[in-house]
Amino acid sequence: FICVGKEEIIDYVTTSGTLGDPVTFVLTSEDLDRLSYNEFLSFTTTGCTRQDILQLMTTIDRRFMAGLAYYMGARELGMGVIRVGNGIPELQWDTIRRIQPTCGMVVPSFLIKLIEFAEKNHIDYNACSMQKCICIGEALRNQEFQLNTLGQKIHDKWPALQLYSTYASTEMQSSFTECSEFHGGHLQPELIIVEFLDDNNQPVAEGEAGEVTITTL
């Protein structure tokens, strides 16, 4: 539902539509500030500082909320940002060579494509400037917080690259991000309340699977 006048709406986005028709969401200026703050917290959780340069390997348009959020959060932290967008491995590697970014924001399966391109073109990716990637959209770890098949495949090829997993959704406009312990995403308690509920809307026991239920603050 929308609880402000249309003149208060600054940004229109939609969900990805993975499980059905995309759902439209709208944001006010204050919502965008909150979004920026969430990503600021996510970047600091991964250890990023204003000394880092972020290569943004996701779209910032196409009704995608998170691309703009990453840029705004990095700006709030004071990082340099290179808005390369998604795809085009040749452009990604040219950017890494030219600007020497230290951190990437990327869908992890695209890292496989970057590795394949580098190997075909004799690029020593383990010696490049990229130290870490914050990964979105796909799981990197299993329930025991060990790297899954995708995460392990990347790590085996590119062991010098730290992989940080995230969990987020358009609906909650917040994210859970790993720290350097790589043992699960951190809740941002000033932004959301999270519950894990059963079919009767009751909290599940410790270790049981439940519906992730978010209340935004």
Summary of predicted features, one role per range:
Residues 145-217:
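Conserved AMP-binding/adenylate-forming
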Residues 15-18, 54, 104, 168:
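Conserved S/T- and glycine-rich ATP-binding loop of Class I adenylate-forming
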Residues 77, 99, 129, 158-159, ...:
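Short, structured coil segments at secondary-structure junctions
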Residues 101-150, 164-172, 195:
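Adenylate-forming
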Residues 28-44, 53-113:
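AMP-binding/adenylate-forming
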Residues 49-51, 127-130, 160:
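A general structural motif
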Residues 1-14, 20-37, 41-45, 49-51, ...:
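Nucleotide 5′-phosphate-binding alpha/beta core
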Residues 55-57, 131-136, 212:
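Extended hydrophobic secondary-structure segments that form protein cores and membrane-embedded regions
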